Every structure is written in C-alpha cells, then in structure tokens.
Amino acid sequence: MNNKPIVVALDFDDKNAALQLIDRLDPQMCRLKVGKEMFTLFGPELVKDIHSRDFDLFLDLKFHDIPNTVAKAVTAAAELGVWMTNIHATGGLAMMEAAKKALVPYGKDAPLLIAVTVLTSMSDEDLKLIGIDVPAFEHVQRLARLTQQAGLDGVVCSAHEAQLLKSSLGESFKLVTPGIRPAGADKGDQHRVMTPPQAIEAGSDYLVIGRPITKAADPLAALTAIHQSLSIPG
C-alpha cells in the first residue's frame, strides 16, 4: 500500500469555504480532488491555490470527446501540473491512445492518466436503460482491459471490482475507488460502497472520500481516523 492513498473529494460552490477546509487538512496525509462543478466555477486559479498549499491534485473532469479534443484537454491538465486526471473509457481505444500520447513529452512530470469505467452510482438496471445488457462488473472488466491496452495508468472502479481487476491486470495498474465510506457513515448516492480497510484489502490503490471528511466537525480528525484504520504511520 502507498503511504498516501486517501484522496479528499472537494464539492463546494464557495471558494473561500473550500480553501478554509483545505487549510484544515494536511498535504502529507492526503491528496485532493476537484471535479466539474468547482473547476467550472473557479477555473485554473483554484488549481494554483491548491498547489500553493502543497497538495497533489486529481483533476476529475472525465474528458469524453473525439481523440484530438481529448488529447488537447489532457495536455492542458498537464500544463496545470496536476497529479492525476481522467477520461471516459467509453470514448474508445483511439481516444485513450491519443490522450496517453499527448502526455509523452512531459515524461516523469506527466499526470497519471486513468479512465472511468462504470460510475459507482449506476446499478445493473441503470446500465440496461442505456442499452448495456451485461452486469456492471462484466462491463467494468471489459473497459478496464481496453484501458490497459491503450497504455493508461489505471481505472476508476468500485472497490467491489478491485480484487479481480488487480489480479487480472497486475499490481502496477492503479485502481482509484470512489464510493468509500468509513464504518457507520451514510452511503449518500453511492450504490456500491466499502469501508477504507475493505477497499485497500480488495486491491484499491487510491480511495476517494468526500463528505465523511469534508462535512466532519473536525476534518483533520476524520482524516486521521481513516489513516489509523489503514495502519498508516504518521
């Protein structure tokens, strides 16, 4: 297990509130994730504010477009200096290969590039409604194999898929898992959830955790408790 597996998901419509929360966290204990809402509201300046506080950033914009457009988008993310960014595996092999190729000039400074498989909010019935008549797990496996074929660094997946994906795709293929809730926490709108220790045991490399930390009375204490549950020193 890496020593900084926790990625705190920021979901704020108030920049000052977000920065106040960030200032209560420790960059040695977690990374941060910014998604579509916050990036649309606050743009690249928010990324700079986060970097100035020494946090690694996962820019979670889930690019999905024609290959050339997605290649340019991930290049823009690399120029911002983010630690990780993502694209939709359903964009296809050519799109994913173009995105990966666009990051080659950045060498070791390139962000990790991962693909979204099946959103953790989607059930088998939800998939059927959009014409995918296989169980979520089977569809995740198919998309994950395609992602690895394209040369990407890993996928976003439910912790329930992690064990088989890790065993079939290898230790170096990173698994980023949302839908993580500490024991006793509300599941919210996530259908397929696990606790942090369960997810790590299953093979997840990075755990995306939002409200259990960001809405806690003491966010740093909540983060520390999760660290302790994972037996992470520090």
From Swiss-Prot:
Transmembrane segments: none
Binding partners and assembly: Homodimer.
Name of this chain's protein: Orotidine 5'-phosphate decarboxylase
Listed pathway(s): Pyrimidine metabolism; UMP biosynthesis via de novo pathway; UMP from orotate: step 2/2
SUPFAM superfamilies: Ribulose-phoshate binding barrel
InterPro entries assigned to the protein according to its UniProt record, in alphabetical order: Aldolase_TIM, OMPdecase, OMPdecase_AS, OMPdecase_bac, OMPdeCOase_dom, RibuloseP-bd_barrel
GO MF terms, alphabetically ordered: orotidine-5'-phosphate decarboxylase activity
GO terms for cellular component: cytosol
Gene3D superfamilies in the cross-refs: Aldolase class I
CDD domains: OMP_decarboxylase_like
Positions contributing to substrate binding: 11, 33, 60-69, 120, 181, 190, 210-211
Family indicated by similarity: Belongs to the OMP decarboxylase family. Type 1 subfamily.
Superkingdom field: Bacteria
Source species: Shewanella sediminis (strain HAW-EB3)
